[in-house]
Every structure is written in structure tokens, then in C-alpha cells.
From Swiss-Prot:
Domain of life (superkingdom): Eukaryota
Main location: nucleus
Region (Disordered): 464-512, 621-652
Protein purpose: Involved in recombination, probably acting by stabilizing recombination intermediates during meiotic crossover formation. Required for normal germline development and fertility. Required for meiotic progression, complete chromosomal synapsis and crossover formation. Binds double-stranded DNA. However, also binds branched DNA molecules, such as those containing a D-loop or Holliday junction structure. Probably not required for formation of DNA double-strand breaks (DSBs).
Tissue: Expressed mainly in testis (at protein level). Expressed in spermatogonia and enriched in spermatocytes; absent in testicular somatic cells (at protein level). No expression or low levels in other tissues.
Organism ancestry: Eukaryota, Metazoa, Chordata, Craniata, Vertebrata
Comp. bias regions, Low complexity: 467-477
Gene that this sequence comes from: Redic1
Polar residues biased stretches: 478-491, 639-652
Compartments where located: Chromosome
Entry protein name: Regulator of DNA class I crossover intermediates 1
Organism of provenance: Mus musculus
UniProt subunit comment: Interacts with MSH5. Interacts with TEX11.
Length: 652
């Protein structure tokens, strides 16, 4: 079937013509080869005619000689503005900057480095500058040198901050030279001085010393906001030794100025300033007496008595050393509260170790110094100050004693029983080592009560007080003392005053309550009265009383950690259960019961913290023991663990 338009026939005709042409060309080639004497190719050629033709053409071209020379390419200028130079010389492009030869002296650049060479006073002279001073304008950022502007007296008067100066490197004048040149510069009054004075004077005082290269990384003086104390804070400066080529730290004094220098500067009215510097450099010589051996000054004790909640935060952060009657703050922990200098003083290498105050309840309370002996006069002063300071607090919260007769009787009882009196205990025992193996939040406190009727010792009553939450109890004394002082005698006496006064107050209140029931049967047992029942009368032998007193004296705690003192009252049917004396310690002994006597009650009061962290929960458990016939019946409440109250009737 033919294609459309007869295209198939045309293709066939072309193929036939090509075959015929190849045939005739082949015949011509053979005839030529025969004429040239070339061997005729094989009848069955494996190479196509195209390749054969290329081979022939290549042979013909190789026979020809290449006599023509290569032509050099001509440069075509794309930008017609430029002209091709005809002469051989350096080209000057119009876009290049103007060439100016540099006149900088690279050898003098090392003088502008902040690490300057330090010369002695004999070698001080002007530093060689560059020949062309205009070149320093390009490098003014690296020329931070000590330069005192001409407006230095004005800045001293106006109390302005020092502005950063970048100028030609040269040696600034010393303070002595500056004062002699400007005799009327800087008049001060009332001991108040600007910041720029000390910073500039200290910057140029001992800057140039022999055989050292100083690199002051951070040495600005900062003044605190308090203008009364006049404390100045300083940071350490890094000193680079030229011989050993190593950095070492050097403790500089707060004011690198000598006393004669200060007197020369302020000859007219500089007495106040010299006295001020003496107070700063030697702060404790005016506060502490000669016979005072404490590590804490009187000003610190007065501050602590006024601001008791800040005791714990203050003493945990700072430690104190005693070096040649100079109060020095340790360099690692430089925190101060009152008029102490916060910084580093020039202290010799062999310094005494720090004695930090021990404020953790979980640690072992050990005295830092041996206990001092106190005579009878100091103990009497201790008692009088105790009664004067703490008696008003107990009377305002619990009421006054009914009559002067009861007060005199209580005082006589306190004298007859020195075992239970806090003031008669030697203070050496209070300083002894105490091992506090209880939790930090719970302080076991305990007292041994004496039955006021017949002198029978009651069972031991143990109270667990939570030191942080005990302020929300029923009858809490809001006078927190939250730290343990082990080396200051004044603080120890103050704490003992509080303990003794609270002991006496609790005993007075217990006596007042029991006086309503049976005042005529009360005996001479004042110090540890805790529980009195109006319908209970017990008898005991004198041997039992002596044994109980001996056990109490032996088991009394040898050391004392003052915590928050709590007096808890619980009255049911004219019976008051009080936690009279809150002495921290561990005492679990009970006096043996002889004859037909019986235990009255055991009360365990535990203050625990709620899950909501709002207020403590009181958990009381009372265990009544062998009831006696003919005794009265009274209702008591036993608090369960869950906080539910269940009325119970116990016959005693």
C-alpha cells in the first residue's frame, strides 16, 4: 500500500540511486588503485566507505607542507576610553587612591600599649613619642594612658564621675606633684569625699615602681550608697612580674595612700579625712576595748539584738579573723552588715584560720575557743539583766502574779533548788561540744516536771518543736533566735538570759494556775512545775526524790543550742499542762516509782507541717496509766493522727 502522496516510491528511488552511485565510485577507485600500483582491497571490506574516504583525505593532507606562518592575535579594546600606551612605563589607573608615603614609626608603637614599662622615681621622664604626632590620631583607641585633665580641681569640687580620656601617652603627675602645683584644689567638709578623688589618687600613687610591669585589669573603687559608714569597696588588681613572667595576685589596701600624704594634701582642714582613713584601715581599734577577746564587736551585737531575723543570713555568709587587733573580713567571703569594711586589707601570708559561726542544726556545735570562767559578779549581772529584759514579755502575755507573797515564795524555791535553775549552771557546760543528731526542722526539747502536791517526779515530757513553724502555736513567744553562737560571750549571755527568763515565766504561770485549786498544798518545787491535778495527791519517799534529782542533774544537756522558745498551755477543768523550760537536749530517763504510786500522764506534743505549708498541726497523745479508786474524773481530748478530736473519760 503506497503512502499518501507517493512518498514511499520517492524514498525507494533515492536508495537505488545511492547504491548505483556507490557502485560507480567503487569502480573508479579500483581503477585508480590499479594505476597507482596499490594492492586492491579485500573483496569483503569490513570498513564503510566513509571511513575509507577519511583515511584517503588524511593521507593526502599529510603530504602537503605547511608553509604558512601563524598570525598574532590583535588586542581588541572593549573600552574605547583607554588608549593603548605607545611607550613602556608604569600605568597609573585613574581609580587608584592618591599615594602618600607613610611616616609612621612602628618602633614607637609599643609605648602606647596599656602594659607600660614602670620606672622608678629617678628614671621618670617623658616618653618618646613619634616624630609625626598626627599619626596618633588614627590610633587613638590604643592610647589609653594615665592622663589627668586640667579640670581635675573642678571635678573634685563638683563630685562628678571621671570620663574616659584618650590622648597622647605620657606619664601623669603623682599626687604630691599635683598638690604642690595646685595648692588650693579640693576643699572638703563633713568627711564626705567624691568618688573621683580616691580613684585618681590611687591610680597615680604607686603606679611607677621598679622592675615590675603593672596591668590593672579591674581596679576601680566603688563607694557604697551609705554615706554614714563611709565604706569603700575595692577589687583586686593583677600584678605581672617582669622576672618570672607570671601573674600573681596582690592584696592592695582599700586606700593606697599614706598618712603623711593625706596630711600634705589636706593641710588646712584635713584632720577629719585623716581620722576617717584611720577608721577605715583600722576599724576595730575604736570599737573594741583592750580586754575584749570576742570575735564580734559591740556594734555587731547591738545590731543583732535589734535585727534578730537577719542573724542567720549574716553569719552564714561572713567569717571573721583576728589579726593584731584588726577586724579583717576574709577575702573569699567578703560580706558585711554594719560598719565593717568590705574588701581586702593588706594581710600577711601567715594568717590565722577563719572561725565561721556555726548556724546549722545538723552540724556538730563545737566551741572555737576555750571557755572562759565567769565569777559570781558576772552571773549576778546575768540574772539581773535577764529579769529586766524578759519579765515584761511574760507578764504581758500570761498575766501577772496574784500577790507579792507568791512571788517571794517562788524566788525562795528557786534558791533552794539550784539543780533546776539555769543561772547556777556553770557556763563552761554551755560551751561544751553538742552533737545534734536530729533533723534540722525538728528540735527535741524536754523537761522533767515535779508534782507540786507531794514532791513526786512526773514522767518525762518530750516536745518536738519545728524551728521554722513554731511561731504559730497557741502561746508562742514571738522572739526568734535562729542561730547558734559558739565564740561570743555576749551573745551566749544574752541567749542564756532568754532561756532563764522563759523558764521562770513558765514556772510562775504554772504556779498561778495550780494556786486556784490547792494553793495551801504547794511545796517548794518551783523550777519544773508542769502538771497539777486538783483532785490528785501522791506520796513518795525521800529516796525517790533524791534519785530523780540526781538523774536530772546527770542528764542535763552539756551544751545548749538556742532555738525558738515556745510555751504551750492546755487547760481542761482547771488543769494546765505547760511546757515550761525549753532546753534543747536529749533526755529520756524517768524517775523510778516506788510504793503504791502511779504515773499521772504522759503527753507528747509534736508540731508537724501540713501539706498545704500554711500552719503546723498539733498532734497530742495522752496515755493515762493505772487509775486509783476514789479519784476524780475529768474529760480530756486525745488528738488522733488525722486531726480528729475524740473525748475520753479518764479516772485518775
Amino acid at each position: 500500500m503506497n503512502w499518501v502522496g507517493g512518498s514511499r516510491s520517492r524514498v525507494l528511488i533515492k536508495q537505488e540511486r545511492r547504491k548505483q552511485k556507490e557502485y560507480f565510485e567503487r569502480n573508479k577507485l579500483k581503477s585508480k588503485l590499479k594505476l597507482l600500483g596499490v594492492v586492491s582491497p579485500v573483496k569483503k571490506p569490513s570498513v564503510s566507505l566513509d571511513l575509507l574516504n577519511l583515511y584517503v583525505v588524511n593521507q593526502i593532507s599529510s603530504m602537503k607542507e605547511n608553509s604558512e606562518t601563524m598570525k598574532r592575535p590583535t588586542h581588541v579594546n572593549m573600552t574605547r576610553d583607554l588608549k593603548v600606551p605607545l611607550r613602556k612605563h608604569d600605568l597609573e589607573l585613574p581609580m587608584s587612591p592618591h599615594c602618600v608615603p607613610s611616616k609612621l614609626c612602628i618602633d614607637d608603637m609599643e609605648d602606647s600599649v596599656p602594659y607600660q614599662r614602670i620606672y622608678s622615681k629617678e628614671e621618670t621622664g617623658p616618653v618618646q613619642s613619634s616624630q609625626d604626632m598626627k599619626s596618633y590620631r588614627m590610633f587613638n583607641e590604643t592610647g589609653n594612658c594615665s592622663y589627668i585633665p586640667p579640670s581635675f580641681p573642678e571635678e573634685l569640687r563638683s563630685n562628678r564621675h571621671i570620663r574616659s580620656q584618650h590622648s597622647t601617652p605620657r606619664i601623669g603627675p603623682s599626687p604630691q606633684q599635683f598638690v604642690y602645683e595646685n595648692p588650693h584644689s579640693g576643699q572638703f567638709s563633713n568627711g564626705k569625699f567624691p568618688e573621683s578623688l580616691f580613684s585618681k589618687l590611687n591610680k597615680h600613687q604607686h603606679v611607677f615602681s621598679s622592675s615590675q610591669t603593672t596591668a590593672e585589669f579591674e581596679a576601680p573603687y566603688k563607694r557604697t550608697n551609705s554615706s554614714e559608714t563611709g565604706d569603700f569597696l575595692t577589687k583586686r588588681s593583677m600584678i605581672m612580674g617582669e622576672d618570672c613572667r607570671s601573674l600573681y595576685e596582690r592584696r592592695q589596701p582599700d586606700f593606697a595612700m599614706e598618712k603623711p600624704l593625706v596630711q600634705q594634701i589636706y593641710a588646712n582642714n584635713g584632720e577629719e579625712f585623716s581620722n576617717f582613713l584611720e577608721d577605715v584601715i583600722h576599724p576595730t581599734q575604736r570599737h573594741l576595748p583592750d580586754n575584749h577577746n570576742s570575735f564580734v564587736s559591740h556594734s555587731m551585737i547591738d545590731l543583732l539584738s535589734k535585727d534578730q531575723p537577719g542573724r542567720r543570713a549574716t553569719f552564714t555568709k561572713c567569717g571573721y579573723d583576728s589579726l593584731s587587733d584588726t577586724h579583717v573580713v576574709s577575702s573569699d567571703e567578703s560580706h558585711s552588715s554594719s560598719g565593717l569594711i568590705n574588701g581586702e586589707f593588706t594581710v600577711p601570708q601567715a594568717t590565722s584560720p577563719n572561725f565561721p559561726f556555726n548556724t546549722s542544726y545538723t552540724e556538730t556545735c563545737q566551741p572555737n575557743r576555750p571557755c572562759q570562767e565567769y565569777n559570781s559578779n558576772e552571773i549576778n549581772e546575768f540574772r539581773r539583766s535577764f529579769e529586766k529584759d524578759c519579765y515584761s514579755i511574760g507578764c504581758g502575755r500570761k498575766g501577772k502574779i496574784e500577790s507579792d507573797k507568791q512571788l517571794k515564795e517562788l524566788q525562795r524555791n528557786a534558791r533552794k533548788h539550784p539543780v533546776y535553775t539555769m543561772a547556777d549552771i556553770p557556763l563552761e557546760e554551755l560551751h561544751c561540744k553538742q552533737s545534734c543528731d536530729f533533723d534540722q526542722n525538728e528540735i527535741p526539747m524536754e523537761r522533767r516536771g515535779m508534782c507540786p502536791l507531794k514532791g513526786q517526779p512526773m514522767s518525762t515530757e518530750k516536745i518536738y518543736l519545728e524551728s521554722s513553724q513554731s511561731s504559730q502555736s497557741a502561746s508562742y513567744s514571738p522572739r526568734p533566735t535562729e542561730s547558734t553562737f559558739s565564740s561570743s560571750t555576749d551573745l551566749i549571755s544574752e541567749d542564756e538570759d532568754q532561756i532563764q527568763q522563759q523558764t521562770e515565766d513558765s514556772n510562775k504561770k504554772a504556779t498561778e494556775t495550780t494556786g486556784n485549786c490547792c494553793l495551801e498544798k504547794m511545796e517548794n518545787h518551783f523550777d519544773d512545775i508542769t502538771v497539777k491535778d486538783d483532785a490528785t495527791a501522791h506520796k513518795q519517799n525521800h529516796k525517790c526524790l533524791q534519785s530523780s534529782e540526781k538523774n536530772n542533774a546527770d542528764a542535763f544537756p552539756e551544751s545548749q543550742c538556742n532555738s525558738e522558745h515556745t510555751v504551750q498551755n492546755k487547760s481542761t477543768d482547771n488543769c494546765v499542762l505547760q511546757a515550761g523550760r525549753c532546753d534543747v537536749g536529749v533526755q529520756t530517763e524517768e524517775a523510778p516509782l516506788v510504793g503504791n504510786t502511779a504515773d499521772v500522764a504522759v503527753q507528747c506534743t509534736i508540731i508537724t507541717r501540713c501539706s498545704c505549708m500554711s500552719s503546723p498541726v498539733l498532734i497530742r497523745e495522752k496515755e493515762s496509766s493505772h487509775p486509783e479508786a476514789g479519784s476524780c474524773t475529768e474529760d480530756r481530748t486525745a488528738d488522733t493522727t488525722g486531726g480528729q478530736e475524740t473525748p475520753t473519760s479518764n479516772s485518775l
